[in-house]
Amino acid sequence: LEGSEQELTKVVQAAKRHWSTALSMALAPPQKTVGRKKPRPEPAPARVVQVFGPDNTEKAAETLREMSSEKRTAGARILEQARAGDGCRTLPDAREASKNLEAKKLHFENLQQPIERLQTDLVLAQAMPAQEFRIAPILLLGEPGIGKTYLAGQLAQALGVPSEKISAGGAQGAFQLSGSHSTWTSAKPGAVINLLAQSASASPVLVVDEVDKIHEDKHAFLPVLLDLLDAGTAQRFRDEYFEMEFDASRIVIVLTANSIDKVPQPLLSRVEVFKVPAPEPAQRLRIMQKIMADLSEKTGHAIAFAPEAAERLADRMDVDLRQLDRMVRAAFAMALQAGDKVARLKTPGAIGPVGFSLRDWAPQQGQPC
């Protein structure tokens, strides 16, 4: 019996030691690992698709060699760029793009609906195989000068892709999209292959401005645009200069128009139309500030708006965004040229002098100059 009591005492004491150790470890503050950093999660691999097939680019190279040296110059660099990465291009990161678009919604209230439509497409595109990635084309409809083209550029920025603008009203013909054949005197590649060749993305943004001004006598500009808007035909889009087909079906196409009455019906049937209202004063003020911030970053100087003057100008709804942009840039340039601390711009009509203050701008560490 005495031996059993001694064994029991040992077991109890050992248990107490284990409990004490466990309790002290639980209550102790976590120790920092010196010289070690928590490894960052690996970024998701970029999704890649074939845009320019190797066989097609090889045939295009043969076509190029048969041209005169003068005509060959126009396409040699573009073909070299198209063949980069074996003709493959990356797709936008749909999650990151959707997050960026969400931020844009806070600054561009008049783009809420088209942004939400793009976000819907991005959610679906992310869940599908890379080959199925598509963003449906949209038409931004609104009065002249409300910033439709500017806003389309902001969408490209959110997607992290380059953009190109073509004016449909001034289009001389289909060759602006699909290139002109080598038999033409001024033969050159089209805007579509140029955009994809120079881009690392399979989904750059193509803005076709003023589609309500397309004329039927413009050498078949409309049929080529319709081919580009249809995913099936866009997969085999042909550039006449290179006599080459390539996959343009993932280009994000944004059309703009001032009046829906003059937009060709076949085009309307292929896009979703969004009415873009004129931006309110608060949004206009943010656009002005964005223009100033961009100029500040590029020049190393900043012009700070005199608050009351900037608000007065933002409230002038009769001054469209094109005029607003010109006025802000002019005020910035005048301030830099004069070296004054305050620059004033006299605007036409009833708008009085608009004041800006100039200060040297030193970018914070880590920011580009």
Description of each model-found segment:
Residues A158-K188, L195, H215, R284:
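AAA+/P-loop NTPase substrate/partner-engagement loops
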Residues P43-K99:
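Interdomain "pre-motor" coupling segment immediately N-terminal to P-loop NTPase/helicase cores
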Residues V207-F246, S269:
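Conserved catalytic/switch belt of AAA+ P-loop NTPases
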Residues T90, I260-P266, P277-V342:
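Conserved C-terminal "switch" segment of AAA+ ATPases
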Residues T183-V207, R238-E245:
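Conserved alpha-helical scaffold flanking the Walker A/P-loop in AAA+ ATPase domains
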Residues A338-C369:
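C-terminal engagement/docking regions of AAA+ P-loop ATPases
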Residues R95-L141:
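Pre-Walker A (pre-P-loop) alpha-helix and adjacent loop at the N terminus of AAA/AAA+ ATPase modules
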Residues F133-A168, A197, Q265:
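Walker A/P-loop
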